[in-house]
Structures are given as structure tokens and as C-alpha cells.
Curated annotation (Swiss-Prot):
Compartments, as annotated in UniProt: Secreted; Host nucleus
Known function: Protein-glutamine deamidase effector that inhibits the host cell cycle and other key cellular processes such as the actin network and programmed-cell death. Acts by mediating the side chain deamidation of 'Gln-40' of host NEDD8, converting it to glutamate, thereby abolishing the activity of cullin-RING-based E3 ubiquitin-protein ligase complexes (CRL complexes). Inactivation of CRL complexes prevents ubiquitination and subsequent degradation of the cyclin-dependent kinase inhibitors CDKN1A/p21 and CDKN1B/p27, leading to G1 and G2 cell cycle arrests in host cells.
GO process annotations (BP): symbiont-mediated perturbation of host cell cycle progression
Active site as annotated: C109, H165, Q185
Keyword ATP-binding recorded: no
UniProt protein name: Protein-glutamine deamidase Cif
Domain note: The translocation domain (TD) is necessary and sufficient to mediate translocation into the host cells.
Family under the similarity heading: Belongs to the Cif family.
Enzyme's top EC category: hydrolase
Gene Ontology terms, MF aspect: protein-glutamine glutaminase activity; toxin activity
One Pfam family it belongs to: CIF
Provenance organism: Escherichia coli
């Protein structure tokens, strides 16, 4: 088994801005089934009210495939009616205020990240809950990645203090010397990067693989307070457009404030969950 080497990058590697996607070494966009399942989930959540409430549900003690979207919707409607009564407003006015116009709610980055983790990991007897899971530092993550089995797939949840952002890195099985990865995210546009719908990212960019080394290089650069806007734009902007970044919003005092959660996953489990969700939301 080959190990992936993750030494601290030199200042030159941090400042070149080069994110080198070797298309011969990584998966082509349509070969990674997990990415396709996440794309289908994002599309469903943008169009179907039941799926959207599953995406935004904060009851993480219940596995995503065991939730009752109809019951959740009924509770939401009851709460909105009560708010309308308490505030002396119409239901429509309340929905505008809380961002629930037409029922579809665009999730924050953290909500999206949590929902994707549940899609990957939830099964009978286990329900992913961000607050309850082990958190790794960058050094601990690097150690784990250095001995990651090539025959297994992993999902990584990232809390990125510098960007004020949370996102998912999907690491399918593959040779560690050129291990592919896929980045999943949404963004309300309140930080460094612009507003981004979950479905738009999954449709237009998420199926294009990056190298795991490249995202790890980003972690290392930011932890050394070496900010490369081209690197950030290449990874996180839907068009790779540096001009769309708001550099003034980078939290430099939090440049090393990364936390990670890393889990092995089974692609069959994702497929099972997405099929159940589609059935629940039909």
C-alpha cells in the first residue's frame, strides 16, 4: 500500500495558486457514484418540499432515512402559524422574514455539510450528529490520511475557521499517490465566498474531481497564514473567479482554526439512503 505524503508545503507551493487536477490520474466526473447520489439529493431538495425539510432538519438523533418529512412539515406549519399569531402578521409575512418563501429553504453551509454526512453514514442503529462525533486537528488528520487504505472510501467534514465555512470532502478509494477527491458545499454568501446554492454547485462543479493533495495543500497553507486567493477560488468558487472573493472577510486570527471529522463509508449505504429518501418524498 502506498502512503500519501503530506509534509508542510514550502512557501512557494502555497503561493503559486496552482491546483493541478491530473485528469488521467483521477476519476472522470461520471464515474463516481457517490457524487451522483449527492447531486440527486441536492436536486431533489431544491424542488421537493419534503426533501427540503429533511435537508434542513436539525433533529440529528434520528437517522435521515427514518425521518418523517410529512410530520416535520406539519410541525413547521404549526410553528409558523403560532409565530404569525404572536407577531400579529400574516403567515406569508412570517415566511418572508424567516426565509421560507414558497417553502423551499436554502441551507447554510453547516446544515448542508451535516445533511451530507447523514446521507453517507446514517443507517439502522447509527445516526450522525456533528456535536457527538470525534473532532481531529490538522496534524491528526494528516496522520490519519498518511495511512489511509487505498481500497476504502472516506468522507471528511471540514470546519474552516479562516473562511468561516463548512464543507465536505469525499475521498473515494484510489491510489494514495494520486487520490481523487470531490468537494460538496453550499454557501449563504456571508463570508469570503459568494452565495451558492447547493444544487448549483452539485450540478456545475462538484462532479469534477480534484486531487486530495491539493485540498490538503490548502489546509497547510492556511494553517501557516499563507493566503492564496487563486487557490481559494479554484477550490470554492463555482467559476474559479478570484474577483468574486471578499478577501477582507478572511479571518486571519483563525487561520489555523480547522477541525475535521473523518469517517469510512460504504457506497451501498448512500444508495440505500437516497432511494429511501426518494420514496419518502414522492
Amino acid at each position: 500500500m502506498k502512503d500519501i505524503t503530506l509534509p508542510p508545503p514550502t512557501s512557494a507551493s502555497c503561493l503559486t495558486g496552482a491546483i493541478s487536477v491530473n485528469t488521467e490520474a483521477v476519476l472522470s466526473p461520471m464515474q463516481h457514484t457517490s457524487a451522483l447520489h449527492v447531486r440527486d439529493f441536492a436536486s431533489l431538495c431544491s424542488q421537493n418540499l419534503k426533501a427540503n425539510v429533511l435537508l434542513n432538519s436539525d433533529d440529528h438523533e434520528v437517522p435521515i432515512h427514518q425521518k418523517n418529512p410529512a410530520a416535520i412539515m406539519q410541525n413547521i406549519d404549526s410553528n409558523i402559524k403560532q409565530m404569525a399569531t404572536d407577531w400579529g402578521m400574516s403567515i406569508e409575512e412570517v415566511e418572508v422574514i424567516i426565509g421560507r418563501e414558497k417553502g423551499i429553504v436554502e441551507p447554510s453551509c453547516g446544515v448542508t455539510a451535516n445533511a451530507i454526512m447523514k446521507l453517507f453514514l446514517d443507517k439502522d442503529g447509527f445516526s450522525y450528529c456533528f456535536e457527538n462525533e470525534q473532532t481531529l486537528s490538522l496534524e491528526q488528520l494528516q496522520e490519519r490520511l498518511s495511512c489511509m487504505p487505498e481500497c476504502k472510501s472516506f468522507v471528511l467534514r471540514v470546519n474552516d475557521g479562516a473562511l468561516g465555512h463548512a464543507y465536505i470532502v469525499d475521498i473515494p478509494k484510489g491510489e494514495n499517490s494520486c487520490r481523487p477527491a470531490f468537494l460538496y458545499q453550499s454557501d449563504l454568501g456571508e463570508g469570503v465566498t459568494r452565495k451558492l446554492r447547493f444544487e448549483d454547485w452539485m450540478t456545475h462543479k462538484a462532479l469534477t474531481p480534484i486531487l486530495l493533495d491539493d485540498i490538503c495543500n490548502y489546509f497547510s497553507c492556511m494553517s501557516q497564514n499563507k493566503t492564496d486567493l487563486e487557490q481559494i477560488a479554484t477550490l470554492f468558487d463555482i467559476d474559479g473567479n478570484v474577483k468574486m472573493l471578499r478577501k477582507e472577510n478572511i479571518q486571519y486570527q483563525k487561520h489555523d482554526n480547522f477541525s475535521f471529522q473523518l469517517f469510512e463509508y460504504d457506497t451501498d449505504n448512500i444508495e440505500k439512503n437516497i432511494e429511501i429518501i426518494k420514496s419518502l418524498c414522492s
